[in-house]
Amino acid sequence: KAAIEELERAVTGLGLKGAELDTIVNGENWDAARFLPFFKAAEAMGAVLFYHPQPQHNFLTERTTRYGLFNSLGVILEDAIVVAILILGGVLEACPNLKVCIAHGGGPACYAMGRLDRGWQGNAEARRSIPRAPSSYQKQLYYDTVVGSEAALRFMIDQVGIDRVVLGSDWP
């Protein structure tokens, strides 16, 4: 309830377009049932939810402490996981008009969509919350351009379309 009130204050009171969220909240994934009212409220407000991982919450923290891997790989893996959670957890099915943008071009999510589809086909748990293959939801999301290379950007555009890509920057 407090998160809904704060989002409403930000959007209606302050004139902001939405909110930036971490890819995990207090150790819980975003497909937890208790977050659905928040998503429904954001959808009703037309608010944009921008997901950007925080390195300290990286699920691979112990394995990415060297070589700057927490930033170069850890955060993009978090991006891909939040894409999968929002899709497979049924959030995008329950809120088809929800405006969600994923940092770093969604990490490797676009590249891995075929694997998510195959996993969905062969796993009853994966099919529980969504009636269609995961790839059919990927164009409901927006992705920023902080992908690291022109080739990655071109691949992402080919997968989701230019109308789902927004300018991004890791610099203020």
Regions found by a protein language model. Give the residues of each.
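Catalytic cores of alpha/beta
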Residues: 5
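Catalytic pocket-lining loop regions of alpha/beta-barrel enzymes
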Residues: 11-166
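Active-site mouth loops of central-metabolism enzymes
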Residues: 1
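Active-site metal-binding loops of divalent metal-dependent hydrolases
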Residues: 170-171
